[in-house]
Regions:
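Nucleic-acid endo/exonuclease domains
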Residues: 1-129
Length: 129
């Protein structure tokens, strides 16, 4: 497995990532404030990784969560997202893409799935924390 070190693209994305943290979508806000902010294993928002900005990132599990809105379903954006996920997975990250509607309509299920992924990736039973 490769080790990733920040590069110049990450530094270029710094201001943009900061801006995205200030202006989250309603679904990102719901996931952050309703679940991830107080999660027993640390998550961060809008993390710069490999020249990209991940919506949410758990370093301990090398887990990236991407919240996909309607614009992610255009052919051009889908191609970009697939390439981006491939690059991140090549670096050893797990990428979980979740649709806005799933967060709106199945919030508990999304949270449960994140719990399962964190436990699988870290080996830590978060139910005991």
């Amino acid at each position: 497995m490769k080790t990733y070190y920040q590069n110049h693209k990450d530094k270029e994305n710094l201001a943009y990532a900061r801006e995205m943290r200030r202006h989250m979508t309603p679904e990102e806000s719901k996931l952050w404030f309703g679940f991830l902010k107080r999660y027993p294993i640390r998550f961060v928002r809008q993390k710069r990784i490999a020249g990209y900005i991940a919506d949410f990132y758990c370093a301990k599990g090398k887990l990236i969560i991407e919240v996909d809105g309607i614009h992610h379903y255009t052919p051009k954006q889908r191609e970009y997202d697939e390439e981006r996920s491939k690059v991140l997975m090549d670096w050893g990250y797990a990428v979980f893409r979740v649709d806005n509607d799933w967060i709106k309509n199945n919030f508990y299920e999304v949270c449960k799935y994140i719990d399962e992924m964190v436990m699988e990736r870290t080996g830590i039973d978060i139910r005991k924390l």
